[in-house]
């Protein structure tokens, strides 16, 4: 019985620290130092939330740049079902999926080069990836330009404007947030 009191005291102390103080402290500091990130990195237009800078969206129209395929369950880019397809490189089903994606992209982009960028046919580990490389966006320019009646120069400048460089040049590669790029496309039409 003598050992019960210190054990119970330690349990209550740790419960208060890990279940109350620590979460409250991290929430307050997160809201104070990183309010945009702590609230989901939401992209707003006026009072309307158009998406998150962290999660891709399923853009299917010819007038939009398309991101990486999503491997999430039920619907594409479902944040509640995040996860990869878990198909190994040696799995024939993965080969079939990639071949189907390549064929669909070539059919939708007849004026683009025949070399489809790899990130447009392979899903990310989370299934929610919102970034593609500037090269993958540039590959889609002929289709988007034709659908929106824009010049190749306009779209090339837009891609350059929305390209994000890595923090350290030799670690990583430039990327484009597909949600922000497509929202910028919609603003060009206004």
UniProtKB/Swiss-Prot annotation:
InterPro entries in the record: KdpC
Keyword Flavoprotein: no
Entry's localization field: Cell inner membrane
UniProt-listed NCBIfam families: kdpC, PRK00315.1
HAMAP family linked: KdpC (MF_00276)
UniProt-listed PANTHER family: POTASSIUM-TRANSPORTING ATPASE C CHAIN (PTHR30042), POTASSIUM-TRANSPORTING ATPASE KDPC SUBUNIT (PTHR30042:SF2)
Protein name: Potassium-transporting ATPase KdpC subunit
Natural source organism: Escherichia coli O139:H28 (strain E24377A / ETEC)
